[in-house]
């Protein structure tokens, strides 16, 4: 039997507003509905999915720090606006040496110029951007195929 893969899903600032915020960009599904759907898919893929959403950078950093002790095998992170500003989150991800996939609902390269730089992409295993909420599911599928083999 395949080992259960422990995945931490981190959603950054304003993603708690999914379903209400800029529906033309982010759609109308709420974060809780998304998480429920991801957990259902995770079970099929033999993934244990833990999730956190925070609007506070330090909370995200502390969760990344604790991921090693929690035996997290892989991280999926949508850092949202912290993508473009947080060297501290970058440093935390480097420090714990847990592989991660960066996910963005919208195509950050097709939006405002200031959104086109990510402090995380060059240290990630991959970046999924602009595929809507499907990007999270693609990240799970990728982890299922590549992790812990």
From Swiss-Prot:
Marked site (Transition state stabilizer) residue numbers: 21
Superkingdom: Bacteria
Top-level class of the enzyme under EC nomenclature: lyase
Residues that, per the record, bind substrate: 78, 84, 91, 105-106, 115
Disulfide-linked positions: none
GO MF annotations, alphabetized: 3-dehydroquinate dehydratase activity
Keyword line: Amino-acid biosynthesis, Aromatic amino acid biosynthesis, Lyase
CDD domains: DHQase_II
GO biological process: amino acid biosynthetic process; aromatic amino acid family biosynthetic process; chorismate biosynthetic process; quinate catabolic process
EC number(s) recorded for this UniProt protein: 4.2.1.10
Catalytic activity: 3-dehydroquinate = 3-dehydroshikimate + H2O
Active site residues of this protein: 26 (proton acceptor), 104 (proton donor)
Pathway(s) this gene product operates in, as recorded in its UniProt entry: Metabolic intermediate biosynthesis; chorismate biosynthesis; chorismate from D-erythrose 4-phosphate and phosphoenolpyruvate: step 3/7
PROSITE patterns associated with the record: DEHYDROQUINASE_II (PS01029)
Role, per record: Catalyzes a trans-dehydration via an enolate intermediate.
Subunit-structure text: Homododecamer.
PANTHER family noted in UniProt: CATABOLIC 3-DEHYDROQUINASE
Family membership: Belongs to the type-II 3-dehydroquinase family.
Protein name: 3-dehydroquinate dehydratase
Name of the coding gene: aroQ
